[in-house]
Amino acid sequence: MSENIYDVLLERGFIEQATHEAETKELLGKEKVTFYIGFDATADSLTAGHFLTVMAMMHMQRAGHRPIALLGGGTTMIGDPTGKSDMRSMMTRETIDHNAQCFQEQLSKFIDFSDDKAIIANNADWLLNLNYVEFLREIGVHFSVNKMLTAECYKQRMEKGLTFFEFNYMLMQSYDFWVLYKKYGCKLQLGGNDQWSNILGGVDLIRRKEQAPAFGLTFKLLTTSEGLKMGKTMKGAVWLNPEKTSPYEFYQYWRNIEDVKVEECLGLLTFLPMDEVRRLGALEGAEINHAKEVLAYEITKIVHGEEEAKKAQEAAKSLFAGGVTSEHMPTTTYSSAAFEEGIDLITMMIDAKLATSRSDARRNIEQGGVSVNDVKVTDFARKFKSNDFNDDGALLVKKGKKAYHLFRAE
């Protein structure tokens, strides 16, 4: 290990808080550290929001450290109240197990789990069979309710009501860290900055029970300039699963981020050298679009592979140039019979998720924000038939400047 990975993560913009900064940096500089990041299995795919922590894991592994990807088969049964205004709906064990399996398959694309270079663990293995009384005696005794109630993750829920069910989450996550410490020698937990209180709980538990050093690091959360979490679109989350968010849509999301976020995302979400990150981030005016293209290409390449990244880039450039419609764009296919009768534009927009509702679609159409084959359409009742197809045998629907969708007949 040459350059200390702590300095690398700091320079690239990852690190927000550290429990023991100097000690953590010293530890990472002198030995191979086993660390963990938890993933609660709340969906069947990782999202763009997860990708920042996945990148951190990749950096750490490349520097010679050993990641543990902890799947939350147990904690997902409770649900993390952090950042939630209401209690999560309870998920079935079968759904959680399925989601955890999907996460494991996706993480294997980014992390090398061969030859003990990394570990996949599932906290269902130790949480679901816990003896409640023993847990309270062994773990609960180390937690002050007074102190827990001052934690940010609980404070914002107190007005609406926090169930005892959710109140246990911090103890369970702390218990995870302790189990991983005993089982694998895990000394460091990493997570998003919204996990700070939970991570502190685990660090403190190990130091109390084992009289041994344990550490926590949190990363900044990807947010827009308004402070909203990045990785969301009108269609919902930006997924890493290509069947839920196509490589083209994934590429377009990063191609269209705010100018002020380009340098930050290049540092966090690509492996480009920091000199190149700073050069691209300093571009202004129309040149910033080149930096966005590099960003979108590099992230898509990591997530979906070089071939899909090139296809997405080609499709985006084809659209921008006003050229022929590309086979790599998001596409919806209707039967030829449906086009013979005619399909109204509102239905097409709903099916393509270019609108959240019929009224939303109608509003966009009437306000002149929608075009079909580069012709603005303001009649929301207009129906399209096969004789409206362009020379490429398709309808290209655009909403605004950045949302596109192709429609074809079978």
Swiss-Prot record:
UniProt-recorded Gene Ontology molecular function terms: ATP binding; RNA binding; tyrosine-tRNA ligase activity
PROSITE patterns in UniProt: S4
Primary role: Catalyzes the attachment of tyrosine to tRNA(Tyr) in a two-step reaction: tyrosine is first activated by ATP to form Tyr-AMP and then transferred to the acceptor end of tRNA(Tyr).
Binding site for ATP: 232
Any single GO BP term: tyrosyl-tRNA aminoacylation
Chief location category: cytoplasm
InterPro entries: aa-tRNA-synth_Ic (IPR002305), Rossmann-like_a/b/a_fold (IPR014729), S4_RNA-bd_sf (IPR036986), SYY-like_C (IPR054608), Tyr-tRNA-ligase (IPR002307), Tyr-tRNA-ligase_bac-type (IPR024088), Tyr-tRNA-ligase_bac_1 (IPR024107)
GO CC term, one of those recorded: cytosol
Family annotation (Pfam families): SYY_C-terminal, tRNA-synt_1b
Protein name: Tyrosine--tRNA ligase
Domain S4 RNA-binding span(s) in chain numbering: 343-409
Assembly, per entry: Homodimer.
Reactions mediated catalytically: tRNA(Tyr) + L-tyrosine + ATP = L-tyrosyl-tRNA(Tyr) + AMP + diphosphate + H(+)
Binding of L-tyrosine, residues: 36, 169, 173
EC number, UniProt record: 6.1.1.1
Residue positions of motif 'KMSKS' region: 229-233
Family in the record: Belongs to the class-I aminoacyl-tRNA synthetase family. TyrS type 1 subfamily.
Organism: Lachnoclostridium phytofermentans (strain ATCC 700394 / DSM 18823 / ISDg)
Phylogenetic lineage: Bacteria, Bacillati, Bacillota, Clostridia, Lachnospirales
Presence of the UniProt keyword Protein biosynthesis in the record: yes
Motif 'HIGH' region: where in chain: 41-50
Location(s) in or outside the cell: Cytoplasm
Keywords: Aminoacyl-tRNA synthetase, ATP-binding, Cytoplasm, Ligase, Nucleotide-binding, Protein biosynthesis, RNA-binding
